[in-house]
């Protein structure tokens, strides 16, 4: 687990929680929740890779882990599109920087999860 990614998650979550986007704050809360969920999933998948013996227990414990992996990639794609949309509509520079960093982090995490999943397959 890359410490820079962990601190990036924490930084972006903190920044997003401070943002005030008026009527769309519910949507922002949804994005924050998705980010937190994605972080937990990424961390657990990374830990499973580090303990390669966990592959069998992961498969036994959850026979649908590949399906869940596909769902996570769908969530990442949704988050990427949502963050891109927010980036296009915001004029606040603080929000623009936050969303640009969030987009970069999502792309990095997507790549990490792909790498982890290939190691587990």
Swiss-Prot record:
Subcellular location: Virion; Host nucleus
GO CC, any one term: host cell nucleus
Keywords: Host nucleus, Host-virus interaction, Transport, Virion
Domain of life per record: Viruses
Alphabetical list of InterPro entries matching this protein: Flu_NS2
Major site of localization recorded for this protein: virion
Chain span(s) of sequence motif Nuclear export signal: 12-21, 85-94
Pfam families reported for this sequence: Flu_NS2 (PF00601)
GO biological process: exit of virus from host cell nucleus through nuclear pore
Assembly mode: Interacts with protein M1. May interact with host nucleoporin RAB/HRB and exportin XPO1/CRM1.
Additional notes on this entry: Average number present in a viral particle is estimated to be 130-200 molecules.
Protein task: Mediates the nuclear export of encapsidated genomic RNAs (ribonucleoproteins, RNPs). Acts as an adapter between viral RNPs complexes and the nuclear export machinery of the cell. Possesses no intrinsic RNA-binding activity, but includes a C-terminal M1-binding domain. This domain is believed to allow recognition of RNPs bound to the protein M1.
Family membership: Belongs to the influenza viruses NEP family.
Protein name per its UniProtKB record: Nuclear export protein
Species this protein is from: Influenza A virus (strain A/Wilson-Smith/1933 H1N1)
């Amino acid at each position: 687990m890359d410490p820079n990614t962990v601190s990036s998650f924490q930084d972006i979550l903190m920044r997003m929680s401070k943002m005030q986007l008026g009527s769309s704050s519910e949507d922002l809360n949804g994005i924050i929740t998705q980010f937190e969920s994605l972080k937990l999933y990424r961390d657990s998948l990374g830990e499973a890779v580090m303990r390669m013996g966990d592959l069998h227990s992961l498969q036994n414990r959850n026979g649908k882990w590949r399906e869940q992996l596909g769902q996570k990639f769908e969530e990442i794609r949704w988050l990427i599109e949502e963050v891109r949309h927010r980036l296009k509509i915001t004029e606040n520079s603080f929000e623009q920087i936050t969303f640009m960093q969030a987009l970069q982090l999502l792309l990095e995490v997507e790549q990490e999860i792909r790498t982890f999943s290939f190691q587990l397959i």
